């Protein structure tokens, strides 16, 4: 209890080191939005020549109040309280509320898929926007091809170093982002003095007035560009477990002030230069003196790389959580760092690299990428709001307060979603298609698990204890292994999969000193590591339930070593003396793991939809990792056996013996 209380204190406590870590991990995406957000707003109005004072004030006001209502109110003040044992993100939120309604898995899948799709586009748009600052350096910039090649090289380097972990360069993230936000704040403050009337934008009147003003050429759809300023808000919630709530509470005011100052500085510059004709204007770089541009390009590129790294790492975490929640197939996961949160998934890394590079080559400029950027993340935010509503209900908040919060958020985010729909034909359809593909895989994987559970037959192990005891003493069979371990996906008290007992007794009688039946249960808590043992009133049958958090590695052999030691020390399991061993006094025998895989066979009587789901799953499994690596069995003795999933329509085919004499010449011989 004391350790839990101490952990709660550290989670809610803010430190100077935690402040820097938060800057480096949490705010990369939202912190780089000044690179391109104002550029998109100006372009939507038709360029600098078409800007009026009321438009500029209204646009900056929309930026300020979007950051306030969505990022500050929804995520910092409300969502950060919805932590699952100090972990945040849409899947952590889902595990908190999934018992309230079965259908809540739908917004969880949609939100997770769109967040992954957004994670592929963000590195492309942030790095490209930073490199495009070279347009102000004439002796460096030649054409857009230079920007594209430079961007592709940086992205290639970024994805190639993922296998080594981010801990080494990660130590620099915080200080670099502190410099970045300091630059945003100072430069924004200085440029605000170009026209101090920009401070009027704090008044929300200008934001509301712009939405209905005839001067606003984009009309309601300007919200599609405005939303770019808060696309990183979801990442803020997802990274809760990495930095703690206290550090976010302390660091967000600093970050928000710096970002708002940057937008105000850009707005003041626009006020001072409105009416001018400047091609391909990016206010972020336009406010800078010419001799500073190259240095700011370098700094902004570093900030963009850090933002991209945070999203890549976040994608790895998101996929690993989805796997443990049985929403995605198994992928090989490596842990290159020394901390629990550092992981690397080669398949996901390669997919992100290819997709991000495709976006750079397809869209070519940040201008075209921005058009496709915000739609997916608006969907994610709407799904998070749906889950958040049920969390507030679960916590017993007054219904009036819940209605006020939920309706308000749905109206605001729904407006951004509707405004972003126009971007569908401008390239957002690609991101939506990627999200739909991920949703399809999630649906197939989740549904197939439920179908398999329905068809797996169970037997009461108590009815077979005598046979197992007789087999272990039957010396007419060679000793298969001292310990035989079966991993089972379904184990309810004394009931286990029929296929397992068939494997032990029928397929090839497996004589062993001890039979282990292990079931891994993923808990709603992220870092649970517990087990429960039932010896079935014997000293040779061990039922083990492993309770592992959804962020824990499912490395069964390592946990079994601890369990065996505990059972022998408590006297529940006899010591297994080994006559031959390089380890003096070894008291534990050898182990063999048997993985029984159900294959779809004889499924003619299965409903067509279920057959389609299982056949699709089988095709997907061909390109995913095997259970052997997932459960950490690659260095153990393993046997993989295949059994048919459906046996209901297996019957003898009707055939009769021919009794009369047959002239064999009637049947022509076949060659």
From Swiss-Prot:
Keywords: Cell membrane, Ion transport, Membrane, Potassium, Potassium transport, Symport, Transmembrane, Transmembrane helix, Transport. One of its GO terms (cellular component) is plasma membrane. The keyword Transmembrane applies. Transport of potassium into the cell. Likely operates as a K(+):H(+) symporter. This is Probable potassium transport system protein Kup 2. The chain crosses the membrane at residues 18-38, 60-80, 103-123, 149-169, 173-193, 218-238, 252-272, 292-312, 343-363, 373-393, 402-422, 424-444. One of its GO terms (molecular function) is potassium ion transmembrane transporter activity. It holds the Pfam family K_trans. It is found in: Cell membrane. Belongs to the HAK/KUP transporter (TC 2.A.72) family. It catalyses: K(+)(in) + H(+)(in) = K(+)(out) + H(+)(out).
């Amino acid at each position: 209890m004391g350790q839990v209380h101490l952990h709660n204190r550290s989670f809610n406590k803010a430190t100077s080191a935690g402040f820097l870590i938060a800057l480096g991990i949490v705010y990369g995406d939202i912190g780089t939005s000044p690179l391109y957000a104002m550029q998109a707003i100006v372009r939507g109005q038709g360029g600098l020549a078409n800007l009026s004072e009321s438009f500029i004030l209204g646009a900056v006001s929309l930026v300020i109040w979007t950051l306030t209502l969505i990022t500050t109110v929804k995520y910092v003040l409300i969502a950060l309280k919805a932590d699952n044992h100090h972990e945040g993100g849409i899947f952590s939120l889902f595990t908190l509320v999934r018992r309230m309604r079965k259908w809540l898995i739908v917004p969880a899948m949609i939100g997770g898929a769109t967040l992954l799709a957004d994670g592929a586009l963000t590195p492309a748009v942030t790095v490209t926007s930073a490199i495009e600052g070279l347009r102000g350096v004439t002796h460096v910039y030649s054409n857009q091809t230079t920007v594209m090649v430079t961007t592709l090289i940086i992205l290639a380097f970024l994805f190639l170093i993922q296998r080594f972990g981010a801990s080494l360069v990660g130590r620099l993230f915080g200080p670099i982002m502190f410099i970045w936000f300091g630059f945003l704040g100072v430069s924004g403050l200085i440029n605000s003095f170009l026209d101090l009337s920009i401070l009027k934008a704090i008044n929300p009147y200008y934001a509301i007035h712009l939405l209905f003003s005839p001067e606003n050429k984009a009309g309601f759809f300007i919200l599609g560009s405005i939303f770019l300023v808060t696309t990183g808000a979801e990442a803020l919630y997802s990274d809760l477990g990495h930095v703690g709530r206290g550090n976010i509470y302390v660091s967000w005011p600093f970050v928000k002030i710096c970002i708002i100052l940057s937008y105000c500085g850009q707005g003041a510059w626009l006020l001072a230069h409105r009416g001018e004709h400047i091609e391909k204007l990016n206010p972020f770089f336009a406010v800078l003196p010419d001799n500073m541009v190259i240095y700011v390009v370098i700094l902004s590129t570093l900030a963009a790389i850090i933002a991209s790294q945070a999203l890549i790492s976040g994608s790895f975490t998101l996929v690993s959580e989805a796997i443990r929640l049985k929403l995605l197939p198994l992928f090989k996961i490596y842990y290159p760092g020394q901390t629990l949160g550092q992981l690397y998934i080669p398949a996901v890394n390669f997919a992100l690299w290819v997709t991000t590079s495709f976006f750079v080559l397809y869209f070519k400029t940040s201008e075209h990428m921005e058009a496709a950027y915000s739609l997916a993340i608006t969907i994610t935010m709407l799904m998070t709001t749906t889950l958040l509503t049920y969390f507030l209900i679960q916590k017993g908040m007054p219904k009036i307060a819940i209605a006020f919060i939920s309706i308000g958020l749905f109206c605001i985010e729904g407006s951004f979603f509707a405004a972003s729909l126009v971007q569908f034909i401008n390239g957002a359809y690609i991101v939506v298609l990627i999200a739909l593909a991920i949703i399809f895989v999630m649906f197939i994987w989740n549904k197939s698990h439920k179908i398999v559970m329905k068809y797996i037959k169970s037997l009461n192990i108590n009815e077979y204890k005598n046979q197992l005891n007789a087999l272990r003493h039957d010396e007419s069979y060679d000793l298969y292994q001292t310990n035989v371990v079966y991993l089972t996906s379904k184990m309810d008290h004394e009931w286990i999969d029929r296929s397992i007992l068939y494997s032990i007794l029928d397929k090839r009688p497996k004589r062993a000193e001890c039979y282990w039946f292990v079931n891994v249960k993923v808990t709603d808590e992220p870092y649970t590591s517990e087990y429960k043992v039932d010896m079935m009133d014997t000293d040779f049958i061990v039922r083990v339930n492993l309770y592992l958090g959804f962020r824990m590695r499912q490395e069964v052999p390592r946990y079994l070593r601890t369990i065996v030691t505990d059972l022998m020390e408590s006297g529940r399991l006899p010591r297994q003396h080994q006559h031959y061993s390089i380890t003096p006094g070894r008291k534990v025998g050898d182990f063999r793991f048997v993985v029984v895989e159900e294959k779809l066979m004889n499924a003619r009587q299965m409903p067509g939809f279920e057959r389609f789901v299982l056949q699709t799953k089988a095709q997907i499994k061909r390109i995913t990792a095997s259970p052997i690596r997932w459960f950490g069995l690659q260095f153990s003795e393993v046997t993989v056996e295949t059994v048919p999933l459906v046996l209901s329509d297996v019957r003898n085919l009707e055939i009769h013996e021919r009794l009369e004499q047959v002239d064999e010449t009637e049947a022509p011989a076949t060659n």
